[in-house]
């Protein structure tokens, strides 16, 4: 069967937004207007089709990006729902990798909020063209033009309104289309699909003219031809304006802005028209970079012909079909029942069934074509971020980077009988989510789970109960401390054992140097004249790496250290890899004790939005938690406080903040960097660890 939608008419888009901007409602309406779901799901009553996991329904927040296919004006739109909560930034990163364009939804009252900044940064990182939809225009305090200012000032974007609102709050009637210069009005609330084109209301004519001129100016800057025409005083045609907007959108030099209220069904159809008109088809975005095993780079172009190449970007467990692996096909096509080659793992995989997801319904398909997104059933070894390719062309597409977790808790099943069920559940969840890790504490034998924040781990424990029926007891949250050194030292260490028969001999001189934060570990071999034979150098490196696992102060992993082996000696008979590994390991530990070792802790970027009267209390409390306040702003009549706070002091913050501000303040928090722990705190940590 050949493809039904040509590549040119495919759009892979994500809806990205802050937690309450109305992203799920917007996705819902898109599905409704494109005819996929008949009754509109409301987040308010917890029945949205996009939010298909139980907890999302309860918390009213979107956690997993379900990929949904729908159709609008002969175009296939693959909608990837992205979560809007900071603990799930990894999900957002992951979906940004496979999207070609995004719709950024902002609340007309809240405007640009902390999570929007994070999502915007990630979209910039992956070069994702976007259009803005200012939602909730019917709410009290709605202000489209404020949001435009904030996108300019806070996000440093170049917003270009293609519409301006007619009225706001209760009087929001529709929008003025600045391209056709017509008013689009939704008159009958009971028939959300119908809107009428009218003349622009007299009182808005001047504003519409002013914004049309701004739009035309922005469009004329996208090409020399349009600029000449514009400067020569000629009118640009509607087609030229649209082509200019698309060019500006794709080059990221402008962000087209639209508005509406998804909840009241106003403004969604023009948004869909804009997705089709201005966001890129898979063959209009930059080629994706790939490499072969030997490191040669290659550029993979999105085409139907050519060897198959796809990226697995999400794994989910579905109660009916088992494990689903969501893939984005970049080149060629994939048939159900065929084989594909996992070039990241170097393994052959059999492709079972292929599914296309329509929010929570699934359709079985025979083939997945270039540019499309679907789910594969039956893959054994493929994890998030792996490449599936053809055996003839084993390309590895760009790998995704996943952050290290910053918080851990110990979990134990309520009953001993559940121990095995719990391990199975945790391993399945870890397969789905690369920012979540499971390990065993060697001393206590407890199972430790680690993730990106308190909410992240709460949801994992919750999913164990719901999906795998395992009840777990959760310990106190533990912070992922690290250690590093502050001084350069040189250390000699000789490991020599003589105990009948063959001895052990390894002798090294190591130089330990501190590195910039975030550099990790660097090993340098500076041995001259073979004083340590080449074959023992990897053992020295390995010995140092083993010592890095447990720092000298409190046994935390050591990072940001450069270790150079620059001298040493060996024994013809007694030297061995083992001896050099031990010499390096012990030498590093001795050196680290003299190198001014310090403990580092994760610092979180905290943003609190509070009514002015509680500002003093909030700041006082952040200072008590060893926080450093960086800035204070105003937004929508509230004060915004940004601070860096140690994660160790932030447990249970939401409850404290609620009681300080009578529940009127909100906050968001994400990991930012590691910083040195003050001496008094460091002493306490060491005392606790070394008991």
Swiss-Prot record:
Gene3D superfamilies associated with the record: 3.30.230.10, 3.30.70.240, Elongation Factor G (Translational Gtpase), domain 3 (3.30.70.870), P-loop containing nucleotide triphosphate hydrolases (3.40.50.300), Translation factors (2.40.30.10)
**What is the annotated localization of this protein?**
Cytoplasm
**Which BP terms does GO give this entry?**
ribosome disassembly
Record keywords? Cytoplasm, Elongation factor, GTP-binding, Nucleotide-binding, Protein biosynthesis
> Signal peptide location in the record?
none
| CC terms in the record's Gene Ontology section | cytoplasm
SMART domains the record matches = EFG_C (SM00838), EFG_IV (SM00889)
Provide the primary localization: cytoplasm
Can you give the residue ranges of the tr-type G domain?
A: 8-283
Record InterPro entries: EF-G-like_DII, EFG_II, EFG_III, EFG_III/V, EFG_IV, EFG_V, EFG_V-like, G_TR_CS
Where does the chain bind GTP? 17-24, 81-85, 135-138
Task: Output one GO MF annotation.
Answer: GTPase activity
**Per the similarity annotation, which family is this?**
Belongs to the TRAFAC class translation factor GTPase superfamily. Classic translation factor GTPase family. EF-G/EF-2 subfamily.
Q: Which PANTHER family match?
A: RIBOSOME-RELEASING FACTOR 2, MITOCHONDRIAL (PTHR43261:SF1), TRANSLATION ELONGATION FACTOR G-RELATED (PTHR43261)
Query: What task does this protein carry out?
Result: Catalyzes the GTP-dependent ribosomal translocation step during translation elongation. During this step, the ribosome changes from the pre-translocational (PRE) to the post-translocational (POST) state as the newly formed A-site-bound peptidyl-tRNA and P-site-bound deacylated tRNA move to the P and E sites, respectively. Catalyzes the coordinated movement of the two tRNA molecules, the mRNA and conformational changes in the ribosome.
**What name goes with this protein?**
Elongation factor G
The species is: Campylobacter lari (strain RM2100 / D67 / ATCC BAA-1060)
Q: Which gene encodes it?
A: fusA
């Amino acid at each position: 069967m050949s493809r039904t939608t040509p590549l040119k008419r495919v759009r892979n888009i994500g809806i990205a937004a802050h937690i309450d901007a109305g992203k799920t409602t917007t996705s819902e309406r898109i599905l409704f207007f494109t005819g996929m779901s008949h009754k509109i799901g409301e987040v308010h009553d917890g029945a949205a089709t996009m939010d298909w996991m139980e907890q999302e329904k309860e918390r009213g927040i979107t956690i997993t990006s379900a990929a949904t296919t729908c159709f609008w004006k002969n175009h296939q739109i693959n909608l990837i729902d992205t979560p809007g909560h900071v603990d799930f930034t990894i999900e957002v990163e992951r979906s940004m990798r496979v999207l070609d364009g995004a719709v950024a939804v902002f609340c007309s009252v809240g405007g640009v909020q902390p999570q929007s900044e994070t999502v915007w940064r990630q979209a910039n990182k992956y070069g994702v063209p976007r259009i803005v939809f200012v939602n909730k225009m019917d709410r009290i305090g709605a202000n489209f033009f404020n949001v435009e200012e904030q996108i300019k000032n806070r996000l440093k974007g170049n917003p270009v309104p293609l519409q301006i609102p007619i009225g706001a709050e209760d009087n929001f009637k529709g929008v003025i289309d600045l391209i056709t210069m017509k008013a689009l009005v939704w008159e009958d609330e009971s028939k959300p699909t119908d809107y009428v084109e009218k003349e622009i209301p007299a009182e808005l004519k001047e504003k519409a003219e002013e914004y049309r001129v701004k739009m035309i100016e922005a469009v004329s800057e996208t090409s020399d031809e349009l600029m000449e025409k514009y400067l020569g005083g000629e009118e640009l045609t509607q087609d030229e304006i649209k082509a200019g907007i698309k060019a500006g959108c794709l080059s990221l030099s402008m962000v087209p802005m639209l508005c509406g209220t998804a909840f009241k069904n106003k403004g969604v159809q023009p948004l869909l028209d804009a997705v089709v008109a201005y966001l890129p088809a898979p063959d209009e975005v930059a080629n994706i970079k790939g490499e072969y095993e030997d490191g040669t780079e290659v550029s993979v172009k999105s085409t139907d012909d050519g060897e198959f190449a796809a990226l697995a970007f999400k794994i989910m467990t579905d109660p009916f079909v088992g494990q689903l692996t969501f893939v984005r096909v970049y080149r060629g096509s994939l048939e159900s029942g065929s084989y594909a080659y996992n070039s990241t793992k170097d393994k052959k995989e059999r492709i079972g069934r292929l599914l296309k997801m329509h929010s929570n319904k699934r359709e079985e398909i025979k083939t997945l074509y270039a540019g499309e997104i679907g789910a594969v059933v039956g893959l054994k070894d493929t994890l998030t971020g792996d490449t599936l390719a053809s055996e003839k062309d084993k390309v590895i597409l760009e790998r995704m980077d996943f952050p290290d977790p910053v918080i851990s808790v110990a979990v134990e099943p309520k009953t001993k009988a559940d121990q095995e069920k719990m391990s199975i559940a945790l391993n399945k969840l870890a397969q789905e989510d690369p920012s979540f890790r499971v390990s065993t504490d060697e001393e206590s034998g407890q199972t430790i789970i680690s993730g990106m924040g308190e909410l992240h781990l709460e949801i994992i424990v919750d999913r164990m109960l719901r999906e795998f029926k395992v009840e777990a007891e959760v310990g106190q949250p533990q912070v992922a401390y690290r250690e590093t050194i502050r001084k350069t030292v040189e250390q000699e260490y000789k490991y020599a054992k003589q105990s009948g028969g063959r001895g052990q001999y390894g002798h090294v001189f190591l130089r330990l140097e501190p590195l910039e934060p975030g550099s990790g570990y660097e090993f340098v071999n500076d041995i001259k004249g073979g004083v340590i034979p080449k074959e023992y150098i990897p053992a020295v490196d390995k010995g140092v790496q083993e010592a890095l696992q447990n720092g000298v102060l409190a046994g935390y992993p050591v990072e940001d250290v450069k270790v150079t082996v620059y001298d040493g000696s060996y024994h013809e008979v007694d030297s061995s890899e083992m001896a050099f590994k031990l010499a390096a390991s012990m030498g590093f530990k001795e050196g680290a004790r003299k190198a001014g070792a310090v403990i580092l802790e994760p610092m979180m970027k905290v943003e609190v939005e509070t009514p002015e009267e509680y500002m003093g209390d909030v700041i006082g409390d952040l200072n008590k938690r060893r926080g450093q306040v960086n800035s204070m702003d105003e937004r929508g009549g509230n004060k915004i406080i940004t601070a860096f706070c140690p994660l160790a002091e932030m447990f249970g913050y939401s409850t404290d903040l609620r009681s300080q501000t009578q529940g009127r303040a909100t906050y968001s928090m994400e990991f930012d960097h590691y910083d040195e722990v003050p001496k008094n705190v460091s002493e306490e940590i060491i005392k606790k660890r070394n008991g």
